[in-house]
């Protein structure tokens, strides 16, 4: 049985709300907020899609291991890269034994294919940066042939810029490759969106293959794409904006929770973009509608929406969410059915 956690992060994540990000000191004063400042489309591009995997539950709220295995297979078969032990997999709510068991199952099913996994270090406000805890998580992920996604923590994001970059360099020295992660404080109190100067240095760490950007601000993500194109074109800017999944047309790749609901449809959409098929926009509109519905306030309840949707599709046996994660009303299911009907031509 999954037991509720009483950690600070757990209590906060249950209650978090998304608010529209305001203009702040991350925006340059000379930014030009005109159409001309928006990056050009990068059409006919092969998109690298990473999909955060929902950890499904049984009716008695134990982990549905068979449902997890089948969803991993489904995601691999669609051509997406599974991302396990992320927020969608209750990263802040599961214990270490469960975390390792998920890695073991994923490694077995991957059979040498790429997957990524969250390196989550839970700490408290004013905590010191705990490099050893990060290295333990990284070692566990790499021993299971995964690529670590470096979650932020209070200790990490409290560092001054030079110390912060040194910390990522230490992480890089211990990894074959890793994915960075910027998280806005509207999602978690330990999150931080880095300055453009820090970002420019971060993407030059050789082992850092990419970074997920979750500010919910297109302009901030466009700025990162511009820096990427100038400094390191092979670097992956992974959009984490489930409310703007069309960021891929500007050159972002993605690491999304929304895609766990439809890895087949996201993969089909991505192929349409590579082929130059205008049907991309029609399918993207439906998926974005699903995203707006799933990620409405309270945002953490998107995981319950995902469970309802996957159950509706006959992919998991139960639509329950984690007992410490907020839930959605059963009345949502009727709306999800209408969205699923809209998806029918693409299934």
Give the residues covered by each predicted segment.
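N-terminal polybasic/positive-inside topogenic patches
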Residues: 2, 22-25
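Active-site beta->alpha loop and helix N-cap motifs at the rims of alpha/beta catalytic domains
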Residues: 31-191
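N-terminal cationic leader/targeting segments used for protein routing and processing
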Residues: 7, 16, 25, 29-30
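C-terminal alpha-helical cap/extension of soluble enzyme domains
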Residues: 37-38, 51-54, 79, 252-253, ...
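Catalytic alpha/beta core domains of metabolic enzymes, predominantly
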Residues: 179, 183-299
């Amino acid at each position: 049985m999954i037991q509720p956690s009483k950690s600070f992060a757990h209590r906060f994540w249950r209650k978090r709300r998304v608010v529209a990000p305001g203009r702040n000191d991350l925006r340059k004063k000379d930014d030009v907020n005109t159409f001309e400042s928006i990056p050009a489309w990068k059409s006919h591009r092969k998109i690298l899609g990473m999909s955060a995997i929902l950890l499904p539950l049984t009716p008695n709220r134990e982990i549905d291991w068979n449902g997890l295995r089948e969803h991993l297979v489904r995601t691999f078969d669609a051509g997406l890269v599974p991302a396990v032990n992320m927020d969608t997999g209750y990263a802040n709510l599961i214990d270490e034994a469960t975390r390792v068991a998920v890695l073991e199952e994923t490694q077995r099913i991957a059979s040498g294919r790429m997957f990524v996994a969250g390196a989550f270090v839970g700490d408290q406000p004013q905590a010191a940066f705990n490099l050893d805890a990060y290295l333990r998580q990284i070692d566990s992920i790499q021993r299971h042939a995964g690529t670590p996604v470096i979650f932020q923590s209070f200790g990490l994001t409290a560092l001054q810029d030079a110390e912060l970059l040194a910390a990522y360099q230490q992480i890089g020295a211990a990894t074959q490759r890793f994915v960075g992660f910027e998280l806005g404080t509207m999602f978690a109190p330990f999150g931080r969106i880095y300055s453009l100067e820090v970002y420019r240095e971060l993407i030059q760490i050789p082992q850092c293959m990419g970074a997920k950007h979750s500010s919910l601000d297109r302009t901030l993500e466009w700025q990162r794409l511009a820096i990427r194109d100038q400094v390191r074109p092979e670097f992956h800017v992974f959009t984490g904006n489930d409310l703007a999944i069309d960021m891929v047309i500007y050159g972002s790749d993605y690491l999304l929770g929304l895609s766990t609901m439809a890895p087949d449809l996201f993969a089909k959409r991505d192929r349409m973009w590579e082929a130059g098929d205008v049907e991309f926009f029609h399918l993207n509109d439906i998926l974005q509608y699903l995203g707006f519905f799933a990620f409405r306030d309270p945002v953490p309840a998107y995981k319950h929406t995902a469970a309802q949707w996957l159950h509706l599709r006959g992919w998991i046996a139960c639509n329950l969410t984690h007992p410490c994660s907020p839930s959605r009303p059963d009345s949502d299911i009727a709306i999800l059915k209408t969205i699923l009907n809209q998806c029918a031509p693409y299934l």
